[in-house]
A protein has these predicted regions:
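Conserved N-terminal phosphate-binding loop of PLP-dependent enzymes in the Aspartate aminotransferase
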Residues: 1-180
């Protein structure tokens, strides 16, 4: 799988039982990674790292995956959910940029962004593909801020869009890919 995906040397694969479990593992990885970011360690008074998800995104019904799922009707019954997961308008580069810009150590600043999770073709609210410019901007912002880019390919991976993974059509390489 690593070779087929064109992943860098040293990449790893985690096998689970479902898409939700794959997304759960990706979010756990992001939480662990976030603790290593400057200013994010709670042990030394840092602010918890954040995970950015998209409006209209669906990542599963387990607690972590549900926390990154946007639809209030699905989420509300199970609150409180995993903290420090925020939503930005899917496709809005300025909103994504603003989410990264909110990082700061001041009284109103937030912790650093550990990861951005997105589906390249959202299916919960219809078939809504994200634009290539948006996806490339997300990759660039993640690189600039040392955040992980998580691509949820549960509904789009393994050849469902004409390539092995949908991200291959966008000319980017994510840090984490989940699929079932």
């Amino acid at each position: 799988l690593v070779k087929l995906a064109g992943a860098p040397e040293g990449s790893r694969v985690y096998f689970g039982n479902s898409g939700a479990e794959g997304n759960e593992a990706a979010l756990k990885l992001a939480k662990l990674y976030g603790r290593t970011l400057p200013g994010a360690s709670p042990e030394i008074g840092g602010k918890p790292a954040r995970i950015i998800s998209m409006t209209h995104g669906f990542h599963g019904r387990t607690m972590g995956a549900l926390s990154a799922t946007w639809k209030p009707a699905i989420r509300e019954k199970f609150e409180p959910l995993v903290p420090n997961i925020e939503f930005v308008e899917a496709g809005n580069v300025e909103a994504l940029h603003d989410a990264f810009a909110e990082t700061g150590q001041g009284k109103y600043g937030k912790g650093p962004v550990a990861a951005v999770i997105m589906e390249l073709i959202q299916g919960e609210a219809g078939v809504m593909p994200l634009g290539a410019d948006y996806v490339k901007a997300a990759r660039k912002l993640c690189d600039e801020h040392k955040a992980l880019l998580i691509i949820d390919e549960v509904q789009t991976g393994i050849g469902r869009t004409g390539t092995l993974f949908a991200y291959q059509q966008y000319g980017i390489l994510p840090d984490v890919v989940s699929f079932a």
